[in-house]
Amino acid sequence: MLAPHISVVNLGCRVNRVESDRITADLMRLGFAIVEPQDADLIVINTCAVTGEAEAKTRKAVRHALAYPGEPYVVVTGCVVNLHPEELLELSDRVIAEPSKIDVAERVCEVLGVESDSVPACSDGEVVDALGRSRLGVKIQDGCNHRCTYCIVWKARGPERSVPVESVLEQVREAQEAGVPEVVLTGVNLGAYDGKSATDEHVEIDELLEAIMERTSIPHVRISSVEPMDISERLLKVMARYPQRIAPFLHLPVQSGCTATLHRMGRPYSAEAFEDTVRMIRAILPQASLSCDVIVGFPGETDEEFEESLALCRRVGFSRMHVFRYSKRPGTLAADMPDQVPPEVMAERSRRMRAAAQELAIADARRRVGMVERAVLEYGDNLTLGSFHHARLDDTCGLTAPCLLDVAIIGVDDSGLVHARREVHGSLED
């Protein structure tokens, strides 16, 4: 009998991506064949609810899956399932909800009638073998204790909790042994990491990063999103001590560059405090690139407040910006705030912010010409630099992707694409 065919569809954030990869590897370990959705007997959809648009994409993905001629079952998991599963269950009796992502593989067995007393957890090495990733996400934290007025994720993900230190180190070592050139530490609120050591001591994010440097040989580590108020001098100094092994990159979800807007959002810092944090980063990590999330059109955002936000982004000089139009989420405080911004105003502000983002990305890339950076060769001649810019390598002779190498940045084209050459013994190759 042929093994049932399964497809895993991921929607949403980097944390979801890491969780979907693990679900895929769990299913492969059980002998299921992973295929494209149109060929599947069962489709797993890891859902996202961060915005109204994300929820709409989830419903569309489920309807699309149900429409395939093979009439597959659809197992849904993730944030939408944790908030209001009935919206998906009412679409068909072929839709099955599984709130616990670690139990998805077992639920798949149940739906398809495959005997399994329990589903063993897979290792990160098996994830790499199954998915062929050039970098591996290591989830070290989940949940959020903040209550930002626009956000519904804390309801979907629950309170903050952290993976124990020894478990994180084991995952990193497995990735290293599998030949992964870079791991990315991920979490819903990464800077709130508060794991327990083997001796039951509390360990914060900077101490965890130091432990990874001292107790593993992983070639390269990247930190994903860290809230601005969680950026500490201690964390930055750890990053500065290991410039060859820690990517000089931080993603800071500033959300707005206007203090009045930040206050209505329930963000625990001012625009001035954010810029103080940026100055501290620049002082300790002068070559670091900074990316951000920014929301336009939050309730009550005036033209003047938007201009303040745009001006801050220009002053900081972000290398990458994720620009979101405010999305009204039922059950949040912001949904009932007065002075909701008209859609056409949001659209224009989004256009201007995205235009600025493109200009800033190119400017940051161009200031790096002549610098040497660590980079991951992903495939072909495609590189991801330590600064998280995408680049093309001029010569891949003798290289097998994925791999880590030093490159010299030699140019940037008008689209912002970086061009690089291999660095040998501290000088450009002739």
Model-derived regions, located:
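Active-site proximal loops enriched in glycine and acidic residues that flank catalytic Cys/His/Asp
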Residues: 10, 187, 225, 254-256, ...
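Contiguous mid-protein beta-loop-alpha structural module that forms a pocket-lining wall or clamp
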Residues: 301, 317-318
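Proteins enriched for Cys/Gly/acidic motifs involved in redox and nucleic-acid/cofactor modification
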Residues: 1-194, 201-204, 250, 272-283, ...
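Terminal RNA-binding accessory module
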Residues: 336-430
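Conserved SAM/AdoMet-binding glycine-rich loop
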Residues: 74-75, 83, 177-303
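Short flexible coil/turn linkers enriched for glycine and charged/polar residues
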Residues: 131-134, 144-146, 256, 288, ...
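Hydrophobic, well-ordered secondary-structure elements that form the walls
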Residues: 252, 293, 313, 321, ...
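Short, conserved loop/helix-junction motifs that constitute active-site signature segments
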Residues: 67-69, 240-244, 317
